[in-house]
Structures are given as structure tokens and as C-alpha cells.
């Protein structure tokens, strides 16, 4: 399967305008691992998640198959960027305490990617992918937002649809 780079043309705009995740997410991710030596942010894009993870991990290895995305990634002393596919990372075996993916998992070849995650995760490491982890975080961190949105909709007469 050949990588089709759909993000190079607008990589500067993507880096400038992509919304960020709440700071509580990064603290929660860090709380899921006993060690904090190495994180791998796969499909890093502009490095947004990688830079935040650098506040919790000594080293962050941030990869993306798009050279243009990496070229526009935010620099940080603890983040090392590499142009690599998700399915073939340059980290050694059992070297990562945490593996994250922001909004890129749907682009990956799942079987090959999860095999790579299993290879690079050290014992006790965490890779909180999937709906369960997202749902748990979402419930805890955004409940107040949706409560406020419902209240605001009731006051203004607008109806929010999902």
C-alpha cells in the first residue's frame, strides 16, 4: 500500500489552525504509564500532541509519513521528528512507555500498525487506542461542556444535534 499524502498542500495552514486537545488529556495519558522515558506520537502531523507529551516524557519520538507535515511541526528540545509510516517505526523493541495517535488511526493498516505498537511498547507501557479509552476520557473531561451547551440551547431556543 502506497502512502498518498493528502496533507502536504495545506500543511502550514493545518499547523496554524488545527484545534488542540484539552491539557487534561495529556496528564491523563501520562498517568497511564509507570515510566516516562519515551513516548511515540504516531501520525503526529504538526507535532501538536508530541509537544504536549514532552511536558510529561523525557523523550518523544514523533512520526508522520508526510514530509511536509514534519517540516511544519513545532520544534521542541524533547521531541525528535521522523518521516516514517505508522507501520514501520524507527524505535527499538520495547522502548516506548506510551504510544499515542491523535486523529490518524483511520489512515493506518491496522494489523501492521498494532503489530508495530506491540513491538515498541515496553512491559507496563500503554497504548490507549480505541473507543473505550476515548469514551472514558470524554466522559470525564467534557461532561461540563455538553451540560453548558444543552443549557445554552434551551435558553436560546436552538437545538444542538449530534
Segments predicted by a language model, with ranges:
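A short beta-strand submotif of the Rossmann-like class I SAM-dependent methyltransferase core
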Residues: 101-102, 110
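Conserved alpha-helix/loop element of class I SAM-dependent methyltransferases that forms part
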Residues: 19-37
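Conserved catalytic/acceptor-binding region of the Class I
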Residues: 118, 122-162
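A short, conserved alpha-helix within the catalytic core of class I
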Residues: 108-116
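A short acidic, Gly/Pro-enriched loop at the edge of an enzyme's catalytic core
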Residues: 87-98
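Class I SAM-dependent methyltransferase SAM/SAH-binding core
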Residues: 40, 46-88
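Class I SAM-dependent methyltransferase Rossmann-like catalytic core
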Residues: 6-19
Amino acid at each position: 500500500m502506497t502512502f498518498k499524502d493528502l496533507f502536504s498542500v495545506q500543511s502550514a495552514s493545518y499547523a496554524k489552525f488545527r484545534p488542540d486537545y484539552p491539557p487534561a488529556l495529556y496528564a491523563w495519558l501520562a498517568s497511564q504509564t509507570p515510566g516516562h522515558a519515551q513516548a511515540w506520537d504516531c501520525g503526529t502531523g504538526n507535532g501538536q500532541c508530541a509537544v504536549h507529551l514532552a511536558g510529561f516524557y523525557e523523550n518523544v519520538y514523533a512520526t508522520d509519513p508526510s514530509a511536509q507535515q514534519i517540516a511544519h511541526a513545532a520544534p521542541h528540545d524533547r521531541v525528535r521528528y521522523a518521516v516514517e509510516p505508522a507501520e514501520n517505526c524507527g524505535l527499538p523493541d520495547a522502548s516506548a512507555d506510551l504510544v499515542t495517535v491523535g486523529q490518524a488511526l483511520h489512515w493506518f493498516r491496522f494489523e501492521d500498525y498494532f503489530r508495530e505498537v506491540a513491538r515498541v511498547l515496553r512491559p507496563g507501557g500503554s497504548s490507549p487506542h480505541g473507543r473505550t479509552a476515548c469514551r472514558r476520557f470524554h466522559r470525564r473531561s467534557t461532561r461540563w461542556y455538553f451540560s453548558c451547551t444543552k443549557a445554552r440551547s434551551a435558553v436560546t431556543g436552538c437545538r444542538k444535534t449530534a
